Amino acid sequence: MHLSEITHPNQLHGLTVRQLEEIARQIREKHLQTIAASGGHLGPGLGVVELTLALYQTLDLDRDKVVWDVGHQAYPHKLITGRYNEFHTLRQKDGVAGYLKRSENVFDHFGAGHASTSISAALGMALARDAKGEEFKCVAVIGDGALTGGMALEAINHAGHLPDTNLMVVLNDNEMSISPNVGAISRYLNKVRLSDPVQFLTDNLEEQVKHLPFLGDSLTPEMERLKDSMKRLAVSKVGAVIEELGFKYFGPVDGHNLEELIRTFKQAHKAKGPTLVHVATVKGKGYAIAEKDQVGYHAQKPFDLATGKAFPSKKPTPPSYSKVFAHALTTLAENNPKIVGITAAMATGTGLDKLQQRLPKQYIDVGIAEQHAVTLAAGLACEGMRPVVAIYSTFLQRAYDQIIHDVCIQKLPVFFCLDRAGIVGADGPTHQGMYDIAYLRLIPNIVLMAPKDEAELQRMLVTGIEYTDGAIAMRYPRGSGIGAPLMEDGWEPLPIGKGEILRNGDDILLIGYGAMVHSTLQVAEILSEHGISATVINARFVKPLDSELIAPLAKQIGKVATFEEGCLMGGFGSAVCEALQDHDVLVPVKRFGIGDVLVDHATPAESKAAHGLTPAQMAESIRAAFFQKDAAKTTTTV
């Protein structure tokens, strides 16, 4: 059977181990070819190929439900659930999503993008099943670092107190999340993974028993059971901790041995109550380059399969915002031992790995534990340290109560640096950084700022480090800067709450925030081609907003447009409208941003075009709204 013929996972039933191994080979081949061509998550999926095939062969997927954590480890799942022929569209507009979506496929039982959600969701399904008197299996596959998240541990705590609720948790233990796992839980799991002596004993047990006089051949049929028993005996002390939590423990099992996996899953399915199957896997399995560099090949841009190297850009690009941030923070930290960089398992993505390498004592990785990261930072601030929480905008949502309760109510000087703010592209709605302006703006005792370019980011970083009158947050986008000239050091802080005028005009006031300032200037240039002169403001701060600058100009000019890369509801444009009303300036305002919709996976350029955020689209919209007679004469295209 060829992988392309599998449209339903139940087609795996009855296949021999050798046939499954061939399917596994084809999955890895398709997986590698696709990611090499279009980019995406590489290592996680390669590590769970055998796990997926073995698990699905022991389930009836017409009834049973499997909930995958995070989602980027579920590419093999996608390939055996009817998406083989469309898999080449992975992470592309209108193509297969990079994560799990209930709307995409009947076998995607729960959407996943953020970590540590699977056990809670699967337990909820199991409880609903029992309440309705139905019978089917509920399985949560968690791993790639997600077990370090507090939510997963809360779910384990709950499930362990439900001895009559059948729930299977499959732990994909590859010793990694995106970066190497940290913390006591990771150390514990490493102890549970088979040690070399135990592995040697079980691997050689069968050969030794064959040489026993009279008994060798007769014991051979029981050998696998005996080997399993010896493994369980070897890990009984550490595995007992899981059983103390109320789970029946199976493992650890070799995550790339199909026979062992199938046998273990069958045994675990017979158990009553919550069970945990501990599967030891290798991230990037089957692609030697990814196995050697598991951090670097967690996700990849399009690359050459033969060398593993990313294809070079067609033209030189400016450094990314993340890279500029990392360099500036490390430079500042070298001269200020109170600066501490904090990441929640995203050292490489945020650039904090540079700080880790240079100043390891001023670096903390808490694992996938955003709530803990924020309150840890609050504690550091209490003792006079300067904590810098570098985190993706979408992940800070997970620590909202801690921002309010532990930081802002106590007016503690914690500096939040929000990477991937705005449209992020192919990762889709679970990772778009749309909401931070709105959800942070309403909290007292926090300052919000966003740089117009990478050079201004350097100055804002100094501003945030020096600000001590409460919390402060800086948002910045994914990807390259605009090519603004950078200084190596000597950056000057910005005055809090003050914007700047970048261009003067008489017909309309254009106010940009953050990465949209560059587009705002482009809009002004397009409007000028039609005889419309615009004043352009770089707001810099949304809280406090520079009302002293904005209100008089809005009153004088009489027409206003705002530009942001985030949700309109409660966002920057809303802040401007509120400020104008507070100053009794009643003028028409046109807001540009993301409406009350989710932004699906596509390139950033495609997403901006889909939401009317290209400079040409915005200029045309302004002309239609404020200068209708002029707009009717000509049109502008890009």
UniProtKB/Swiss-Prot annotation:
Biological process per Gene Ontology, one example term: thiamine biosynthetic process
Gene Ontology cellular-component annotations: cytosol
Pathway(s) this gene product operates in, as recorded in its UniProt entry: Metabolic intermediate biosynthesis; 1-deoxy-D-xylulose 5-phosphate biosynthesis; 1-deoxy-D-xylulose 5-phosphate from D-glyceraldehyde 3-phosphate and pyruvate: step 1/1
Annotated CDD domains: TPP_DXS, TPP_PYR_DXS_TK_like
Enzyme Commission number, as recorded: 2.2.1.7
Function: Catalyzes the acyloin condensation reaction between C atoms 2 and 3 of pyruvate and glyceraldehyde 3-phosphate to yield 1-deoxy-D-xylulose-5-phosphate (DXP).
Quaternary structure, from the entry: Homodimer.
Protein name: 1-deoxy-D-xylulose-5-phosphate synthase
